[in-house]
Curated annotation (Swiss-Prot):
WD repeat placement: 251-289, 293-332, 341-383
Location(s) in or outside the cell: Cytoplasm; Nucleus
Family annotation (SUPFAM superfamilies): WD40 repeat-like
Pfam families for this protein: Beta-prop_DCAF4 (PF23761)
Domain notes: The DDB-box is specifically required for ddb1-binding.
UniProt-listed PANTHER family: DDB1 AND CUL4 ASSOCIATED FACTOR 4 (PTHR44472:SF1), DDB1- AND CUL4-ASSOCIATED FACTOR 4-RELATED (PTHR44472)
Protein name according to UniProt: WD repeat-containing protein 21
GO biological process, one term: transcription-coupled nucleotide-excision repair
């Protein structure tokens, strides 16, 4: 290097070793593999040479590499820079609704959507179960609302439909029914609860409940169509029909953190021990298919029922997409797509959502940033910082209301709404 070295924030240049070192908070320095170090340059050069050798044909001419072309094309279309404040334009796209009627100290956590009655179901850390009906504004321009909202044209009608004595561990909704599970306490064991929401009265009826003692600690739940609901917990999965009766118990050999229904009686479970288990509810076996992810699994999302593709998010910096039709041959299969930019190294439950047709999905990170990907692009096309970083977005849902569509996420004492 000729002349003075470049000044890089957070690094200093050692003239004897002719390389950069990273400065850590305690004042010491450690070698860092970045784009300015010799090791990084040598590794990149060696990787490029290996790639060229692999892409050569018999005649010595380079063969067209579709994956390289696809990645370069995706990278060139990525419009944002990680150090640019434009990444976090939340004023125009992300709206925050403060629910003033909620008591001080209330923190919303779970969300579900009742499609038939166009109602959002919310749960709080204190055990509140709230119904939030989406209604359009009157023709006179006066909003028909039971509380005051700030900074949004959306209109909500909020009502409390239940109160749980124990913390609510999971919430799921189908067309008309609400299903939630509660964690065990010193006085009570884990339980499940089922009720039907009455839109006219703004309350729930046909209430049923039961014990989940076999699960020890319920952790997640999923609607499985006409068969009812599936609840995942400590080393087991319980299948409960719509009448509130336990119909089946499945072994998982690991704590189940996420459940997804793929249709055709297939249920997929993501576990703490990095395994993804596929169950066929028509059989009595433990599981019909098993494969392993790169890290402990936190959230999953299915993109399409006709061509079952599964998004898997774990305690790592990427989200993987698997094709469930080609997972039988290998214990550690290769994902068909990896989505970079995700950040989740601390939390178990963070929001992972998709839109109606599965072409766009979103994920919340432990750095208080919402990221949005297109399923055919490995880099996020939009990133938005969530407010001041007080609360993590642990759950979210795609909502198709009468006056618009978008993602809704519970956040503290309010809601975050993003309309693409």
């Amino acid at each position: 290097m000729s002349g003075l070295p470049f000044h890089i924030p957070g690094y200093y240049y050692n003239s004897e070793k002719k390389r950069y070192f990273r400065i850590i908070s305690s004042g010491q320095s450690t070698p860092s593999s970045n784009i300015y170090t010799k090791e990084r340059l040598k590794r990149g050069k060696r990787f490029n040479n290996i790639s060229k050798e692999r892409t050569k044909g018999k005649g010595g001419n380079p063969v067209f590499n579709f994956s390289t072309y696809l990645f370069d094309r995706q990278f060139s279309q990525y419009p944002y820079s990680c150090n640019d404040d434009r990444d976090y334009l939340c004023a125009k796209n992300l709206k925050k609704i403060n629910l003033r009627q909620l008591p001080v100290g209330t923190e919303l956590q779970k969300i579900g959507w009742l499609r038939e009655v166009n109602t959002i179901i919310l749960t709080s850390k204190n055990g509140d179960i709230l119904g939030c009906c989406l209604t359009p504004e009157d023709k006179s321009g006066v909003a028909n609302e039971k509380y005051t909202s700030e900074g949004s044209i959306q209109d909500f009608s909020l009502s409390r439909i239940g109160l749980s004595n124990n913390p609510i561990s999971s919430l799921v909704c189908n067309a008309m029914q609400i299903f939630w599970s509660t964690s065990p306490s010193l006085q009570n064991e884990g339980q499940f609860h089922i009720s039907t929401y009455n839109q006219l009265l703004g309350e729930s009826n046909n209430y049923r409940w039961g014990s989940l003692k076999l699960l020890k600690t319920p952790l997640c739940a999923e609607s499985i169509g006409e068969m009812g609901f599936a609840v995942g917990g400590t080393s087991k999965i319980a299948i409960i029909n719509r009448e509130g009766k336990l119909t089946q118990s499945l072994q998982s050999k690991g704590d189940v953190f996420s459940l997804k229904y793929l249709g055709d009686n297939l249920v997929i479970a993501g576990c703490r021990n990095k395994s993804v288990l596929v169950y066929d509810l028509r059989t009595k076996k433990e599981c019909v298919q098993r494969f392993y992810h790169g890290s402990s699994i936190c959230s999953m999302q299915n993109l399409d029922f006709s061509q079952p593709k599964l998004l898997v998010s774990g305690l790592e910096s990427k989200i993987s997409l698997y094709d469930c039709r080609f997972l039988q041959s290998k214990k550690r299969p290769q994902s068909i797509m990896s989505y970079m930019g995700h950040s989740n190294l601390l939390e178990r439950n963070l929001a992972l959502m998709k839109n109606e047709n599965g072409s766009i999905f979103s994920s919340a990170g432990d750095d208080y940033v919402l990221r949005f990907w297109k399923t055919d692009c490995s880099l996020p096309f939009k990133e938005m910082r969530v407010d001041d970083g007080k609360y993590l977005c642990r759950d979210g849902s795609w909502v198709k209301a009468m006056n618009g569509t978008g993602w809704v996420l519970p956040y503290g004492r309010g809601l975050l709404i993003y309309e693409p």
